[in-house]
Swiss-Prot record:
Its EC number is 2.6.1.16. InterPro entries: GATase_2_dom (IPR017932), GFAT (IPR005855), GFAT_N (IPR047084), GlmS/AgaS_SIS (IPR035466), GlmS/FrlB_SIS (IPR035490), Ntn_hydrolases_N (IPR029055), SIS_dom (IPR001347), SIS_dom_sf (IPR046348). SUPFAM superfamilies: N-terminal nucleophile aminohydrolases (Ntn hydrolases), SIS domain. It comes from Salmonella typhimurium (strain LT2 / SGSC1412 / ATCC 700720). Catalyzes the first step in hexosamine metabolism, converting fructose-6P into glucosamine-6P using glutamine as a nitrogen source. This is Glutamine--fructose-6-phosphate aminotransferase [isomerizing]. It catalyses: D-fructose 6-phosphate + L-glutamine = D-glucosamine 6-phosphate + L-glutamate. NCBIfam families: glmS (TIGR01135), PRK00331.1 (NF001484). Homodimer. Residues 2-218 form the Glutamine amidotransferase type-2 domain.
Length: 609
């Protein structure tokens, strides 16, 4: 979602700030701005509605000089997307950028108005600027003012503050929204994501919950919310910003779909040895913890929730471990009973998903056996706060609609299933079949991608559709959910997914010639049941699009289009059948002319509730 970049140096920092914002564009935003202060305290602020490129053009027309600055990309929560609502916000000499939501902004706004402050935006962020300004007027340093202001805020925030009268210092505070400090030589930086700072540093300090940081060119001092100084470890990051340009592809999403064979190879690298899954990266004590697991609770949101749903079938049928999957935003607000020796698994591409993080923190109070994060970003909050972590190693994913992060999550989950089956002493053939399937998976997906042109032609049938229904059975039901999510995310077609056995319990009422029905049909023990469901749709004139195993025995006719898929090992079928649904959504979105990589109203990483 929103992005923050800050810098304090002896050189001009405007281009550093702009490049940092460019690297955060993939998260989604509607406006951008920056403010730079020179050594004499002269501040220049630029804000623009739209893309960072528009802000960069404005900076070329009105050059910004100064060694201290903060910048921001905004995803609207309070107040419409507009230049007036774009950050940074100013209260006299106080300048603020902020990620998150201040839940008590309305009473604070009224109190500040009563003190004579005038608001020029609809945002909750302007409250922070005026509040810090007020506290500074009561006396003390900027740090002391921030320490008094922060306890008055309720909600989530990652905020960076500067005082134009003292351009040698930046103040930062975080609670529920990530901030990372980048360490340089005679210069320091701060951002909401380390990716933004990779061009200028590889040394980072990740702020923890409640931290307040005072940053100058030559020092970084960190305090807890009582004002006591604390030490935080600095780390050397080997994270790569490997998105590059789009190359031969029209969109990042298309590129990332085609990267999946190599992404899965990267996920598997170093993790299969002598026909077994090797997850020794979990550390020497992991086997002791995992061997005690009697139940698994998975928390996730969005696409990650769908991957968790697939893995539930695997954990139960292949490892014999009961598994529940819950949307993180639901889990955190209900009273739940914790089962004996239950392992908490959290799934997140970014590792900063607000509800998933909150669920993880809650689980530590509830008595779970331990926690394991599956994530694509090393050093993210989810990874740092979990007992164990497995990286998906998918590489940077730019498209808001997740593709390779989803399939690599499933790859990691399936490896974990194999390891647990071995620890439980189950038949060795289970792990053998999983390893064999995973090793074959990249080439199977490459085979499938060769059918892209056929799927592109198929997508033309959806150009005038307003609704779509996806069906699947067993572990393909969550793949139907994922297919529907992809279609609605990027084409803006209303799409729903159902377990095919539920047709007669409601969805059948929707079937007519204008309702496309997309079915995933691998050749497994549920195929005959699925064929009966397909006949129910055909009998009512529904238009069927069936992605079917080449040996499943389907024949195309007037209202049933069969897209034959190469036969794949049953254990990897859910991962495999995801890819044609990704391509279908992509081509439909192309035809409809939507913004594929940054669909309206959506953000890559949901860091607020």
């Amino acid at each position: 979602m929103c992005g923050i970049v800050g810098a304090i140096a002896q050189r001009d920092v405007a281009e550093i700030l702009l490049e940092g914002l460019r690297r955060l564009e993939y998260r989604g935003y509607d406006s951008a701005g920056l403010a730079v202060v020179d050594a004499e305290g002269h501040m220049t602020r630029l804000r623009r509605l739209g893309k960072v490129q528009m802000l960069a053009q404005a900076a070329e027309e009105h050059p910004l000089h100064g060694g201290t600055g903060i910048a921001h990309t905004r995803w609207a929560t309070h107040g419409e997307p507009s230049e007036a609502n774009a950050h940074p916000h100013v209260s006299e000499h106080i300048v603020v950028v902020h990620n998150g939501i201040i839940e008590n902004h309305e009473p604070l706004r009224e109190a500040l108005k009563a003190r004579g402050y005038t608001f020029v935006s609809e945002t909750d962020t302007e409250v922070i600027a005026h509040l810090v300004n007020w506290e500074l007027k009561q006396g003390g340093t900027l740090r002391e003012a921030v320490l008094r202001a922060i306890p008055q805020l309720r909600g989530a925030y990652g905020t960076v503050i500067m005082d134009t009268r003292h351009p040698d210092t930046l103040l930062a505070a975080r609670s529920g929204s990530p901030l990372v400090i980048g360490l340089g030589m005679g210069e320091n930086f701060i951002a909401s994501d380390q990716l933004a700072l990779l061009p200028v540093t590889r040394r980072f300090i990740f702020l923890e919950e409640g931290d307040i940081a005072e940053i100058t060119r030559r020092s970084v001092n960190i305090f807890d919310n009582t004002g006591a100084e604390v030490k935080r470890q600095d780390i050397e990051s080997n994270l790569q910003y490997d998105a590059g340009d789009k190359g031969i592809y029209r969109h990042y999403m298309q590129k990332e779909i085609y990267e999946q064979p190599n992404a899965i190879k990267n996920t598997l690298t170093g993790r299969i040895s002598h026909g077994q899954v090797d997850l020794s990266e979990l550390g020497p004590n992991a086997d002791e913890l995992l061997s005690k697991v009697e139940h698994i609770q998975i928390l996730a949101c969005g696409t990650s929730y769908n991957s968790g749903m697939v893995s539930r079938y695997w954990f139960e049928s292949l490892a014999g471990i009961p598994c529940d999957v819950e949307i993180a935003s639901e889990f955190r607000y209900r009273k739940s009973a914790v089962r004996r020796n239950s392992l908490m698994i959290t799934l997140s591409q970014s590792g900063e998903t607000a509800d998933t993080l909150a669920g993880l923190r809650l689980s530590k109070e509830l008595g779970y056996l331990g926690s394991l994060a599956i994530c694509n970003v090393p050093g993210s909050s989810l990874v740092r706060e979990s007992d164990l972590a497995l990286m998906t190693n998918a590489g940077t994913e730019i498209g808001v609609a997740s593709t390779k992060a989803f399939t690599t999550q499933l790859t990691v989950l399936l490896m974990l299933v194999a390891k647990l089956s071995r620890l439980k002493g189950l038949d060795a053939s289970i792990e053998h079949d999983i390893v064999h399937g995973l090793q074959a998976l990249p080439s199977r997906i490459e085979q499938m991608l060769s059918q892209d042109k056929r799927i592109e032609l198929l997508a033309e049938d959806f150009s005038d559709k307003h609704h779509a229904l996806f069906l699947g059975r067993g572990d393909q039901y969550p793949i139907a959910l994922e297919g529907a999510l992809k279609l609605k995310e990027i084409s803006y077609i209303h799409a729903e997914a159902y377990a095919a056995g539920e047709l007669k319990h409601g969805p059948l009422a929707l079937i007519d010639a204008d309702m496309p029905v997309i079915v995933v049909a691998p050749n497994n023990e549920l195929l005959e049941k699925l064929k009966s469901n397909i006949e129910e749709v055909r009998a009512r004139g529904g238009q069927l699009y069936v992605f079917a195993d080449q040996d499943a025995g389907f024949v195309s006719n007037d209202n049933m289009h069969i897209i034959e898929m190469p036969h794949v090992e049953e254990v990897i079928a859910p991962i495999f059948y995801t890819v044609p649904l990704q391509l279908l959504a992509y081509h439909v979105a192309l035809i409809k002319g939507t913004d594929v990589d940054q669909p309206r109203n959506l953000a890559k990483s949901v860091t607020v509730e």
